[in-house]
């Protein structure tokens, strides 16, 4: 995509984020199946449901401004993050150590999404897209909350069990 304006940058980032979320919906179910920890599996399933809502919210962002149209593209960053998670699954047994590594992989995804939605919300505000900015901030807060939940699960549950495994 040839970007000449800040709006072009916004559309590119929105399209990239849409692709990232779509890829993530396919990956989260696999992550939930790969874990040995029920709480972690539930967290992955909950984030899958939340991700469906976030995709719908991106659709609402597009509908909120008549000049916005998502471009077909593939988010190579998310593709790489998902590949890392798949490598964790392939290189570990289904136990607490894998669970700890899957949380680390999932948090990389969350941090990427936090960066994406933070930038998108800022650009939407700058472009005067009030409704879009509000929707994007809502998703940003969900991503931050998911990251906090994963950190809590790691510290108070999974990592302790993985440490005792050694």
Swiss-Prot record:
Which Pfam families does this one have?
A: DUF892
InterPro entries linked: DUF892_YciF-like, Ferritin-like, Ferritin-like_SF, YciF
One GO term (biological process): DNA damage response
Q: Which Gene3D superfamilies match?
A: 1.20.1260.10
Say which domain of life the source belongs to: Bacteria
One annotated GO molecular function: protein homodimerization activity
Assembly notes: Homodimer.
> What is this protein called in UniProt?
Protein YciF
